[in-house]
Structure formats: structure tokens, C-alpha cells
Amino acid sequence: MSETTRAWPADTLARVPFWVYQDEANYHAELRRIFEGPTWSYVCLESDVAKPGEFRTTFVGEMPVIVVRGQDGGVHAFENRCAHRGALIALDDAGSVKNAFRCVYHAWSYDLRGNLIGIAFEKGSNGRGGMPADFCKADHGPRKLRTTTLCGLVFATLAPDTPPIEEYLGAEILGRVRRVMGKPVQVLGRFTQGLPNNWKLYFENVKDTYHASLLHAFFGTFRITRLTQGGGVLVSPDGAHHVSYTIGVPEDARSAAYREQGIRSELDGFRLADARLLDSVDEFNDRIQLQILTVFPNLVIQQVQNSLAVRQILPKGVEAMELHWTYIGFADDDAEMRQRRLRQANLVGPAGYVSMEDGCVGGFVQRGAAAASDEVSVVNMGGEGTESMDTRATEASVRGFWKAYRRYMGH
């Protein structure tokens, strides 16, 4: 498929053309230049593949991938595609094998590094048929991905020149990853959520601190995050990664700002029937009650009070995507903390008090801009730059996303 020849409308990060969410050729260029390019894609947790032979299947862009713990103790990743006729090698979301994967179609087999090691009836039957004598199994196999691990997270890349993960993230973002993922984790549950919008609309959404207490009335009503509270936005120098955070400090007279804006949740005096939902503790000892962290191009790490989750963004065509949620706690959590995390999982998730709205608004934009390919969105809140700010009344991290995106795409 030929690449799009459409140009960005102006040399600014504060205007984004709507065709970027709609153009088929541009989408296929994204898969090649971003997801198959020099980026680190999150693929699973280390605990998902804790023992030799344990595996998970996932995607890098639209490429199906197997991630497996090798007998050597390393984590390996390779394309989930049989070298014979292209069928999936592993069909389950997760599982365990002893020493090899076997394709169900023609029983070709692969070791835990993705090397082709066996061909059914390779020598034929009764002296007839079989593969050519000069067929070399080492020359055939699925594509291999390099892997790296950080704080229990597994990342993969197809590119030989992707920098080390620590360099890729930068010191400030790296420190915030370690803040939340600093101990061995335990998986509490998983969801898969289908969204009717381009993948970039969701990634913009989680980088957009401006909307959090406006779209999500629950956040504002119960003071989980409000623009009048403490906090800010950290943006990596290349724009690719970000952290937004809210510090639980008294708002004093500034709390009147939401009433003055006519925000409905501020006027109706809503209350929870069961206040235990918001029973939280300052487990990181820094008063940060909400932190959303993104790693370009497909990872979100969430801390909303004591609800911790890893979200994986998977593109599924121009106008669709999947969001894979993994709720986590720490291996040393006591029963009370585990129950608290499970209860607070009702805050943020596909059917939670908050994220139902995020599941809708991307589709609203996809539909609303359907006939506006040559028009642009306005991303001016907080100026036109991508610098970190000590306020969340800004779209700096959204502009940072487009800064990185344009660099990878050549726009």
C-alpha cells in the first residue's frame, strides 16, 4: 500500500489534522515506522512468563507475537506466524510448553527462541516426497524481536537501533515508573475493551490532563483530581512519554472555581452510598493520589489512589483498537490492601465510574470528524510548547505526543 502524501497543515504542534485518524495509507505507515520501528512496545508482565516455557501471546502493532521464558532464563519474543504457510503458532492467550511450540496446521515446530526445529515428514514417506535435501531450517522462521525488562515490565522491538530502555525513557520518566512498579507485582484481574476509534485518539486522551475532571465528573466531585489541586505534567524531552499527577492538598478558596464554571457534579451535591470505595492510603508516602504515565507507543501505567493497572494499546485498523487492562497489586500486599485494590478497581476500568467516558469520547471524535478530513483540532491549552508544567490546565503532553509522532512518521 502506498503511503499518504498528505502534509501537516502548518509547522505547529497546536493544530492536528483530522485525516491523521482516518487515512488508510497513513495507518499502515504507522505500523511500519512506529510499531515495527525503533520503539519499545510493552508486551506483558515478567510475572506472566515467570517459569521456562510459560508464554503469552500479544501484538506489536498488528503483528501477532509470542513472548516466552526460555530455558536459559531469558525472555524471548518472536512473530506468532508459522514459516510454512503463515498460520498462528500459538492459539491461546497464555499457557506453558515444555521445549517447543508446534503449529496445529502442519505440525512444524519451533524452540523457545522461535527457531524452526522440526518439520513433520521432512524426509517424506516411504522414500517419497519430503522437503528438498538442501532445505535449511535455520533459513526459515518467524521474525525475532529484541526484548528488555524494566520493573517487571517486558518490552519488545523489531529494530536493531532502538536505544536501551533507560535511555529511551529518560531519567525523569524512569523514576516515575520505578515509583509505582518498584516491587514484585501480583495480577488481580484482566479486561479487554474494544474501542470504536483510532488508537491515537485514546493515547491523546490519557495524555490530556485538561479533560480529566471535566469529562469525568466523578473525579471532580470526590476530589480525586481537580485542576485546582496540586500536581502537574512531566513531558520527556522528545515528547514521547509523559506523567500527569495530582497531589492531595487542600484547595481552600480555589474550590469555588468549579462552581463558577457551572460543572454539574459541583452543583448537585452527589454522595457515595458506600464510602469505602474511596478508602485509600498514601502507600508511596508522597501525597500523590493519582498518577497516569505513558510510554510511547502503547503503554499506560495507572495509579488512581490505590488502584494500579497496566493498560496496553493495540491498534486494530484505522477506526478501531483494543485496550488490554491488567489490574495489579504487590506480592507483599496484605488481605486488607488486596481488598482495597479490588474495590477501587470499580473506579477506573471499562465499566468503572470513570473510564466508561473515555470509552465513548474517542468514538465521538471519530464520528464527529468523519467529514472533516481537511480540518484541524485545536491543542492550545497551556500554549504551544511541550515543556513540563506545574499545572494540569494544559495540553503540553498531547503536543508532546504529536512531536514524537511527527518525528517517527516524517510529517
Which residue stretches match the model-derived regions?
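Short Pro/Gly-enriched beta-strand edge/turn motifs at strand-loop
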Residues: 37-48, 126-131, 292-297
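Short, charged helix-to-loop "capping" segments that act as catalytic/coupling loops
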Residues: 32-40, 93-100, 113, 124-130, ...
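Short hydrophobic core segments
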Residues: 30, 81-82, 102, 202, ...
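Short, contiguous pre-domain boundary segments
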Residues: 4-17
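C-terminal catalytic domain of Rieske-type non-heme iron oxygenases
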Residues: 69, 74, 145-411
